[in-house]
């Protein structure tokens, strides 16, 4: 038996909510072991499709390619437990490197391709990384490709040397370069770089398994840097057990099968792409299709059409951009009949957007995921057959073998009753092991209760219904406290999204002499110069639909081409909007 079955029925135990279900049995608790079984079962099935590269791999081919790369990496010194930075877009090289490192027992450290030199150095030095796999160019959404040579020269001033010599990252032994520049970047004089192609050859498939490693299911296999909605990213350490089971359970909720093809625009350097995407498909023998290295709405829709995709992933801003292309006739509204499911995550999905995705893209079984990097990442999720109101107003119920409680913001030991708002805390197999080499930050969020059970305190305000559905009402730090009353930005934002012409909206609190904080809203409107985009009309709209204390004092309009500052997972970085609001108000001399 692959899985140990238990009734997938929730039950309230005291004041916490627990769910039983299945976890992978002892034989398949390491990712490499489980992948070998999938290859044996579904070897001829498509595993990875990279449209931009015109490259695709079956499970057998992915196994052979990752074996070859693993041996190549081993030949340049990669060992079990080494931290290996991978700074690549959604590409075949990234997909192959993922399993090569898992098989070696090395630790995959995905790095955002948009990182600048300072960020890369900080990440590699913090983890004492031994190797870096990096593309010659970084492809970023809505931008021209960026050469990574200046970044490498910052890391290693003299790239012509045959040996790596980096004062900034002394632990660094080797840099493997992936040439994705189509001839725009010449690395022939950089002797300290090892070409990715020199480590593996597609012409000689390596079907022989690697020698067994002495690995444990609780070994760290992946270190993910948190998105950073409020502060500098932290390095969350995830295990074989946590991401293997999380990916499997996500796929179960979507009812994935080997016949499914998942279009995955979200990035592999983030848990959305790597666990919700790649691990979910790989645990079910399904295929994952990457349209481009970085998000491109046209390419995503064309991939769905050409590959007859059955699932589409995205954050709300991605879906909005895709629907706009269809509205404008840039992409013909056809070829989406095979779509049925997918995942919307990163931020709450407005009701109108959900309805349009059902109607226009046939995503009638679209699911909603909730989680955080530190929980591998998903702790709650809707099912494909949950009523639409549950998929709009909640983030679903807990995944199997996850426990949750809602606690007082003032006292973490005070578990609040059902239907009461407080901070959500979760426990179970999915918790990270720690923030790498940061016991202080780890202790701030991973807090044991009186029985010694460790809980991850999410920083999200939530409530839980009697039947286990969780509603996220916002970040605790994003609550606007006006005159001692808590205001939830999401309530205002959902109201604004129903105003004609509004594409996106975000509410933040700004300092106010009388009330402590006042409500400020940022609005992206289709016609920002029109009569409809009027501050007083916006205030009147909110006043008519909500109570007076929720009416924004300040209204800021952005152009349709602009976007809010967001993390890699699509979460709005409200602290940056708050800073912008304060700056603009000071310039207008509206307050001190």
Language model: regions and residue ranges:
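Conserved ATP-binding/catalytic segment of the ANL
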Residues: 55, 76, 87, 414, ...
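Conserved AMP-binding/adenylate-forming core of the ANL superfamily
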Residues: 27, 44-99, 116-121, 191-200, ...
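Conserved C-terminal "lid"/linker of ANL adenylate-forming enzymes
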Residues: 480, 506-512, 520-524, 538-592
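Conserved AMP-binding/adenylation subdomain of ANL enzymes
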Residues: 244-261, 269-311, 321, 325-326
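Gly/Ser/Thr-rich phosphate-binding loop
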Residues: 191-200, 309-314, 323-390, 403
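Conserved pre-ATP/AMP-binding loop-to-beta segment of ANL
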Residues: 43-46, 168-182, 187-225, 231-232, ...
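Structural core segment of the AMP-binding/adenylate-forming
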Residues: 2, 76, 104-194, 527-529
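Conserved structural elements of the adenylate-forming
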Residues: 63-68, 202-208, 217-222, 236-257, ...
């Amino acid at each position: 038996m692959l899985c140990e079955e238990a009734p997938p029925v929730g039950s309230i135990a005291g004041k916490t909510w627990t769910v039983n279900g299945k976890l992978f049995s002892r034989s398949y608790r390491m990712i490499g072991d489980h992948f070998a079984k999938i290859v044996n079962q579904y070897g001829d099935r498509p595993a990875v499709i990279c449209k931009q590269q015109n490259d695709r791999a079956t499970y057998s081919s992915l196994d052979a390619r990752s074996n070859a790369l693993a041996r190549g990496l081993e030949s340049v010194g990669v060992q079990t437990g080494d931290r290996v930075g991978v700074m690549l877009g959604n590409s075949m090289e990234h997909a192959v490197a993922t399993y090569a490192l898992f098989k070696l027992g090395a630790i995959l450290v995905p790095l955002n391709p948009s990182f600048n030199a300072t960020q890369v150095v900080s990440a590699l030095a913090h983890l004492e990384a031994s190797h870096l796999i990096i593309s010659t160019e970084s492809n970023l959404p809505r931008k021209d490709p960026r050469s990574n040579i200046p970044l490498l020269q910052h890391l290693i001033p003299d790239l012509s040397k045959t040996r790596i010599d980096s004062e900034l990252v002394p632990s660094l032994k080797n840099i493997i370069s992936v040439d994705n520049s189509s001839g725009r970047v010449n690395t022939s004089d950089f002797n300290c770089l090892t070409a990715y192609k020199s480590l593996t050859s597609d012409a000689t498939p390596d079907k022989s398994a690697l020698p067994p490693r002495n690995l444990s299911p609780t070994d760290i296999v992946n270190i993910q840097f948190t998105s950073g909605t409020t502060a500098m990213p932290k390095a969350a350490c995830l295990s074989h057990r946590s991401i293997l089971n999380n990916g499997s359970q996500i796929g179960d909720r979507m009812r994935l099968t080997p016949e499914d093809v998942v279009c995955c625009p979200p990035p592999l350097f983030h848990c959305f792409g790597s666990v919700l995407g790649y691990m979910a498909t790989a645990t079910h023998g399904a295929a994952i299709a990457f349209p481009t290295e970085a998000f491109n709405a046209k390419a995503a829709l064309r991939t769905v059409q050409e590959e007859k995709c059955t699932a589409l992933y995205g954050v709300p801003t991605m879906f909005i951009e895709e629907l706009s292309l269809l509205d404008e006739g840039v992409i013909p509204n056809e070829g989406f009949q095979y779509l049925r499911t997918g995942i919307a995550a990163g931020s709450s999905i407005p009701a109108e957007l959900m309805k349009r995705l059902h109607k226009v893209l046939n995503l009638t079984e679209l699911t909603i995921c909730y989680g955080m990097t530190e929980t591998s990442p998903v702790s709650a999720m809707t099912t494909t057959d949950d009523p639409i109101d549950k998929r709009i107003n909640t983030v679903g119920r807990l995944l199997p073998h996850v426990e949750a409680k809602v606690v007082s913001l003032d006292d973490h030991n005070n578990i609040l009753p059902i239907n009461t708002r407080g901070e959500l805390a979760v426990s179970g197999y999915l918790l990270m092991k720690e923030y790498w080499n940061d016991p202080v930050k780890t202790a701030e969020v991973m807090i044991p209760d009186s029985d010694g059970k460790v809980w991850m305190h999410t920083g999200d305000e939530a409530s839980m219904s009697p039947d286990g559905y969780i509603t996220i009402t916002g970040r605790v730090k994003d609550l606007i406290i006006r005159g001692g009353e808590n205001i939830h930005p999401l309530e205002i934002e959902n109201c604004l999204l129903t105003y004609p012409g509004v594409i996106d909206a975000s509410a933040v609190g700004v300092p106010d002499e009388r009330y402590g904080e006042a409500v400020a809203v940022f609005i992206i409107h289709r016609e920002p110069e029109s009569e409809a985009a009027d501050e007083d009309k916006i205030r009147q709209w909110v006043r008519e639909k909500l109570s007076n204390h929720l009416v924004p004092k300040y209204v800021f309009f952005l152009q349709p081409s602009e976007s809010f500052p967001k993390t890699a997972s699509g979460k709005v970085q409200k602290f940056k909007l708050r800073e912008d609001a304060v700056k603009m108000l000071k310039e207008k001399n509206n307050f001190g």
